[in-house]
């Protein structure tokens, strides 16, 4: 229980970065959809993608390079420390995927497409988590538990990017044309 709690504290600390990017971009996207400024939407999206990519690599590096020190903020040496460190190494790849998933969910909300936004959120935080928590521990033991969220986020990113390419850009173009 202690290891899960520590991992979740680290997770929620870092996810705040991605939430901030999504929350900051959403009103800019919404406003510019309404005003028909497609170029500003593209610019905001491009800057968001770049910021997410850089943040994701940095957060992954921090979690792996300084993970021990971060864990020591919560617990001293011992079994819990070693369990948490082993878990963090398996869990940390989540930081490569989660930023884009959170952003694209917020992006579709900003476009007024709540269905796709909810689909992305449901896949990454419920549907695929339940699916992988049922499958991965049977295949990989305890390691599968720690890999559940990274796997859910990794699969979701492919679906979210597909939805962005299929509906995100065309939705904006149609909305801007009809304005």
Task: Specify the residue positions occupied by each region the protein language model found.
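Interfacial/gating helices of multi-pass transporter permease domains
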Residues: 1-12, 79-85
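Small-residue-rich hydrophobic transmembrane alpha-helices
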Residues: 4-61, 65-67, 98-120
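Small-residue-enriched core segments of transmembrane alpha-helices in multipass membrane transport
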Residues: 9-10, 89, 122-131
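Short, function-defining helix-loop hinge/capping sites that tune catalysis or transport
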Residues: 17, 107, 121, 129-133, ...
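A short pocket-lining beta-strand/turn micro-motif at the edge of beta-sheets
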Residues: 23, 114-116, 126, 132, ...
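Short alpha-helical transmembrane segments in multi-pass integral membrane proteins
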Residues: 29-94, 135-179
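Transmembrane alpha-helical segments of integral membrane proteins
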Residues: 102, 128-137
């Amino acid at each position: 229980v202690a290891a899960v709690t520590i991992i979740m504290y680290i997770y929620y600390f870092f996810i705040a970065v991605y939430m901030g990017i999504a929350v900051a971009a959403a009103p800019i996207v919404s406003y510019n959809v309404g005003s028909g400024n497609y170029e500003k939407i593209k610019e905001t999206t491009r800057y968001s993608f770049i910021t997410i990519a850089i943040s994701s690599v940095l957060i992954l590096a921090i979690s792996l390079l300084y993970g021990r020190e971060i864990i020591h903020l919560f617990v001293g040496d011992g079994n819990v420390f070693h369990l948490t460190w082993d878990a963090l190494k398996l869990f940390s790849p989540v930081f490569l995927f989660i930023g884009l998933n959170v952003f694209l969910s917020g992006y579709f909300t900003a476009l007024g497409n709540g269905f796709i936004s909810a689909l992305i959120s449901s896949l990454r935080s419920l549907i695929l988590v339940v699916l992988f928590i049922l499958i991965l521990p049977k295949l990989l033991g305890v390691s599968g538990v720690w890999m559940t969220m990274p796997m859910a986020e990794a699969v979701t990113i492919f679906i979210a990017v597909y939805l962005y390419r299929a509906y995100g850009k065309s939705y904006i173009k149609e909305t801007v044309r009809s304005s």
